[in-house]
A protein has these predicted regions:
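Basic, flexible Lys/Arg- and Gly-enriched helix-loop patches that mediate nucleic-acid binding at interfaces
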Residues: 1-278
Length: 278
């Protein structure tokens, strides 16, 4: 077998996404034949020996791919393991005979739809920012959100680290004294983004539930349970990610073209610039 990039092999073996593999390699946690490797290095899966965090990884060929929709309950962390001993989502899919990992994340206090897979290329496509796959959340905040706060959230707010969020769609479900329940549709995935957005406008999130990601709906799935995605759902997510990447590339090219376009003389037409109007 020909040599392949190590981060590609790691993602295909279900260790993590390709981006996460690059980070792990950069941290010096990966060795091939006993030697540390760099991002971009290659190995022969048939000949070379791979270790991650000093654990040998036995490379499986032609393994079955799994694509799951999991209802992550509150109280579980979205990691493969946790140094603090907290419950992880891996415990909820322990019966799957493959090394799965989460596609994206939900913080410990949030609940709802979480995709899981052992297909690194799929995870990379779905989570990459250029894909722009929409995610639907049901968010309960306190105190009651007024029109100005909702307008700020939908228009994009500046977070505590100085970055500004993209505009998002908001639909108020219930509005009563002391609290508001709304549906928010986002196309980006900053860390704890919705909670930080609400904090920026003076609101506290008391419940956050993801109900959909692209074509995949949480539906009647119960907390802690999972189901396999249909072929149509897997295809739909891939198609949405590809469309998003194409739109991102097109926008970037248009922006570059506009930046290169020659500008006219400052002040308009030089011939008429000195004329006095009576």
């Amino acid at each position: 077998m020909a040599e392949e990039r190590i981060q590609k092999i790691m993602s295909e073996q279900g260790l993590c996404s390709r981006r996460a593999a690059e980070q792990i390699i950069a941290e010096g946690r990966v060795k091939v034949n006993g030697h540390p490797v760099k991002v971009g290095d290659k190995m022969d899966p048939n000949r070379d020996v791979l270790h991650v965090d000093d654990e040998r990884i036995y490379i499986q060929k032609n393994q079955q791919m799994y694509y799951l929709a999991l209802y992550k309950p509150r109280g579980y962390v979205t990691t493969a393991s946790d140094e603090l001993g907290r419950k992880t989502v891996m415990e909820l899919v322990a019966d799957i005979p493959a090394r799965l990992y989460p596609v994206g994340r939900l913080d410990k206090d949030s609940e709802g739809l979480l995709l899981m897979t052992n297909d690194g290329a799929f995870a990379q496509a779905v989570t990459h920012p250029s894909g722009g796959i929409s995610k639907l959340y049901r968010v309960t905040v306190q105190p009651r959100a007024d029109e100005a706060q909702i307008l700020k959230l939908s228009s994009g707010v500046v977070l505590d680290d100085g970055t500004k969020t993209m505009p998002c769609a908001i639909n108020v479900v219930t509005d009563e004294p002391g609290r508001t329940v709304m549906e928010m549709t986002l196309k980006e995935g900053k860390n704890r983004e919705i909670r930080r957005m609400c904090e920026a406008v003076g609101l506290e999130v008391i419940r956050l539930k993801r109900n959909a990601e692209g074509v995949v709906k949480l539906g009647m799935l119960q907390p802690g349970k999972y189901r396999e995605l249909t072929k149509a759902e897997v295809t739909g997510l891939r198609a949405a990610a590809a469309k998003g990447r194409a739109q991102t590339r097109s926008a970037a090219l248009q922006s570059k073209a506009a930046a290169r376009r020659p500008r006219g003389p400052v002040g308009g037409n030089k011939a008429s610039a000195g004329k006095k109007h009576k």
